[in-house]
Every structure is written in structure tokens, then in C-alpha cells.
A protein has these predicted regions:
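Extreme N-terminal, non-catalytic leader segments
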Residues: 1-44, 88
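Phosphate-binding loop that captures ATP/GTP phosphates
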Residues: 66-68, 72-116, 130
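Walker A/P-loop phosphate-binding motif and the immediately C-terminal alpha-helix
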Residues: 31, 36-74, 190
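Residue-level signature of catalytic and energy-coupling elements of molecular machines
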Residues: 34, 45, 71, 79, ...
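Glycine-rich phosphate-binding loops of nucleotide-dependent enzymes
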Residues: 109, 152, 165, 271-272
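Phosphate-binding/switch loop-helix module in NTP-utilizing enzymes
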Residues: 115-163
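Conserved Switch II/interswitch segment of TRAFAC-class P-loop GTPases
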Residues: 143-150, 156-157, 168-189
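C-terminal lobe/tail of nucleotide-utilizing enzymes
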Residues: 1-22, 190-273
Length: 273
């Protein structure tokens, strides 16, 4: 750090080597309170990250916690649909966004809830997307939230960087699938988290197997799982192995994800708590 550093980061460039992680933090507004922030990430798309986010929120809500979901997948939001939430958010007299509340009391803020029509595409460049995420955090009324889950888009680009730098993330869950290729992709997410000094709570493997409805046998439709060796390689616990279950899609499509009562994520919920 330079001897002449004033610690006033607004007076220097973003590339200044003296900047600290804390200097990028965006504070909550004085009317909001969030105790713990958990990011749900994946190195690639299509592994069920939003499903895991939704089910984790439901699991922690079922344990009598106040739960919120900040949907940071700005260009591909799916959280409101899974919970049956439609329409736009409200605004307080102080011009704070009011997250929509699900049937069980989970608070949700998503780009789909600030659009006039939920099918309208979000065609924004990275800085605009990052600005919206910061607004979802600092310009919304999050009242007494025990656990905030942040559903992030796949990869290691602008949005994860924005979330890690500006939100006080307490830990992340990495979502993967059984294919061996995913092990390499998980490695990228692990290394990014380590570079950003964000704790990794563990790995959740989705689509791990199909449970035969007749004999109960586990069928590895995507081949043998490699999540255990991936976890061992990076010294991370495997928090859950979730099956490829048609009920997930059925209930999410119907906006009734909160009615699912499986125990697949009990271990992940324990790690978060």
C-alpha cells in the first residue's frame, strides 16, 4: 500500500493497488437488515442453480427463518416463476423497492419484477446489470432478513465479480452436475472465490441420478458422478446429491416450488446455518 494512500478510494482509479475489498462494499439502506448473505453459483449454465437457490430458501424458511432471494441472474431470471410471483414491485414513500413476498413469506427481488411485461428481454450491458444488482441490495426494503440467497448467473464474469465485491457475502454454494467436464468448470468457480476471499461452504451435485419408480435403484443417466473426487481435490464437502426428479420441474413450472417437501438439501441447510 502506498504511504500516501488516504483510504479515500473515490479519489483514485479502480486499478489502484491500494484499494481494499471493503472499499467496494455497498451499504444497505438504514431501514434494512440482512444477517447472512449466501451466494449460489455455478461455473456453467443448465446445472440447476436457480432450483437449488429456490429449494434452499424454502428449506431455511421452513426452519422459521426470515428469508430473501436477490435474483442476480438479471438477463435470465427464473426465480419469480418458480414461486408463482408475477407483476411489478411496489415502492415505499422513501422510494425503496418493496420485494414481493411468496405464500410462505420469502421475499424476492428480480429483474422480472421491475419490467412491465415479464417476457420483455433485458438487453443491458455489464455496467448497467451491475448497477441494478447494487440497487436491489441497497435501494430495497429488506426487513429483518436472516438469510439472503443470491442467485447468480453461471460463469465467472461481471455479475459474480460485482456481487463478490459489493455485497458482504458470507459464503457460497457451488452447484454442479455429474459429468467429468464439470469438474474443470467447478475449479474455475473455486479459484474465483478464493481470489475474492469468499468462503466456499461446499458443493451440491444436481441431476446426480434418477430413482427408479419400480425398484428404487439409482440410475446414473449422466454417467458416474465425479463430485466426490472434485470435492476431495479442492478440500470441499459435498453437501448434497440431488436426483433428476420430474417433480422439480412440475412444481417450478406451476409456481409451487414451496410445496416440495424433499430432504435432499438438509446437509446444505445445516452448512448455511
Amino acid at each position: 500500500m502506498s504511504e500516501n494512500c488516504s483510504h479515500n478510494c473515490s479519489s483514485c482509479g479502480e486499478t489502484c493497488a491500494s484499494r481494499t475489498m471493503e472499499s467496494f462494499r455497498v451499504p444497505l439502506n438504514p431501514q434494512s437488515s440482512v444477517k447472512k448473505v449466501i451466494g449460489v453459483v455455478s461455473g456453467k449454465g443448465g446445472v440447476g442453480k436457480s432450483l437449488v437457490t429456490s429449494l434452499m430458501a424454502c428449506k431455511m424458511r421452513a426452519r422459521n427463518n426470515r428469508v430473501g432471494i436477490l435474483d442476480a441472474d438479471i438477463t435470465g431470471p427464473s426465480i419469480p416463476k418458480a414461486f408463482g410471483i408475477h407483476g411489478m414491485v411496489g415502492v415505499t414513500a422513501d422510494q425503496l423497492m418493496l420485494p414481493r413476498t411468496t405464500s410462505t413469506g420469502i421475499e424476492i427481488l428480480s429483474s422480472n419484477l421491475i419490467l412491465e411485461h415479464e417476457t420483455d428481454p433485458v438487453i443491458w450491458r455489464g455496467p448497467v446489470v451491475g448497477g441494478v444488482i447494487k440497487q436491489f441490495w441497497s435501494e430495497a426494503l429488506w426487513k429483518d432478513i436472516d438469510y439472503m440467497f443470491v442467485d447468480m448467473p453461471p460463469g465467472t464474469g461481471d455479475v459474480p465479480l460485482t456481487v463478490f465485491q459489493t455485497l458482504p457475502v458470507d459464503g457460497i454454494i457451488i452447484v454442479s452436475s455429474p459429468q467429468e467436464l464439470v469438474g474443470m468448470i467447478v475449479g474455475k468457480a473455486v479459484q474465483m472465490a478464493e481470489m475474492m476471499k469468499v468462503p466456499i461452504l461446499g458443493i451440491v451435485e444436481n441431476m446426480s441420478y434418477v430413482l427408479c419408480p419400480d425398484c428404487g435403484k439409482h440410475i446414473n443417466v449422466f454417467g458416474d458422478s465425479h463430485v466426490d473426487e472434485t470435492g476431495k481435490k479442492y478440500h470441499l464437502p459435498v453437501l448434497a446429491k440431488m436426483p433428476l426428479n420430474p417433480e422439480f420441474a412440475k412444481e417450478a413450472d406451476a409456481g409451487m416450488i414451496e410445496t416440495f417437501a424433499g430432504d435432499y438439501l438438509d446437509g446444505a441447510a445445516d452448512a448455511v446455518a
